[in-house]
Amino acid sequence: MTATTSQPSPASAAAPNDAWLIRCCERGWLPDRLIRAGMRSLMRQRLRDEHAYDGERRAAAYDTLVRELGASPIAIETVAANTQHYEVPGSFFEAHLGPRLKYSCGYYPRGDETLSQAEEAMLALYAQRARLEDGQRILDFGCGWGSLSLWLAERYPAAQIVGLSNSHGQRHFIERCATQRGLTNLRIVTGNVVEFDFDPADTGFDRVLSIEMFEHMKNYGQLLAKIARWMHDDGKLFVHIFAHKLLAYHFAVRDDTDWMSRYFFTGGTMPSADLLLRFQDDVRIARQWWLDGTHYARTANQWLASLDAARPRVMPIFETVYGADARIWFQRWRMFYMAVAELFGYADGQEWGVAHYLFDKRRVLA
């Protein structure tokens, strides 16, 4: 496996080295096809640089990254990360995401699904792979705008669903949706995962599901230990992350050209497909799956098309949030979706993709 701890990430492919070019992109002076071509060029260079290393150097870099994660807090830059994606209100996401407001990869088994169909297909895939049943006590760890929590509450009326978010705005949004739909088996709690812990009387979850949350984390050992404490002895943890098949790296802001890290992923981590397997003191892997990157590329391209169509609805929202920079931020969100599409679509989806894991709680021997 390989890792880099100081070089720019491939997702920074939306960040050309020249700050002037970035300004041109952000102001919409360059056509999308040229912006996308620049992204692909930087991804290609990144992979070329990585594969130039010998095996010994790659292994050493990977071990260094694992040690760095183990010496870190559970998460860093939590305020910045929350602000970057959620300073805009739920109405922005309602304007252009699918009807479930799933702000993560969809599933396209045929390849021609609509965004709505891809949302439903992925949610159903979670239920299958996590081995969900009605009547279980289920935690949605990092519940976002409630796509999974609300879906679970609808599908499993006898289950007790708890969603954990670090955003009070998200909690109020989900609670309002639950009330409108007459759902009484869903509870949302808020807290920063670094400090948050459930009361022991409120633990014992049969299932914990986490969708594109671990990428915002650092110390996976501490995180998994905390989650394991929340689980029933026979409980299972299902994790969905985006990943590279081999590379693992930090999203870091070192200069103005670290565009993705600066505006959308401060403090984040790009895991490799097997990175979580290095942290099994408190959980044990039961199953692992891989979805190629074309699923996320389709998702992001559909988000982009929907965002463009919703521009008249979105711009007043952005003018309230971003003020005089509303037009620039509209283009930044477009570039973000283009970067996601190009990253996961690179090499027909055979470099970056989506990993699913099913973990058992590791039993403590008497």
Name each model feature, range by range.
Residues D234-F242:
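Conserved beta-strand signature within the Rossmann-like core of class I S-adenosyl-L-methionine
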Residues E195-V208:
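A short acidic, Gly/Pro-enriched loop at the edge of an enzyme's catalytic core
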Residues R181-E195:
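Conserved SAM-binding strand-loop segment of SAM-dependent methyltransferases
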Residues G135-G144:
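Conserved class I S-adenosyl-L-methionine
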Residues A243, Y249-E351, D360-V364:
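Substrate-binding/catalytic lobe of Class I Rossmann-like enzymes that use SAM or dcSAM, i.e.
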Residues W145-P157:
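Conserved SAM-binding loop of SAM-dependent methyltransferases across substrates and taxa
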Residues R46-R129:
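Conserved Class I S-adenosyl-L-methionine-dependent methyltransferase catalytic core
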Residues G221-D233:
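A short glycine-rich, Lys/Arg-flanked "PGG" loop and its adjoining helix->strand segment in the class I
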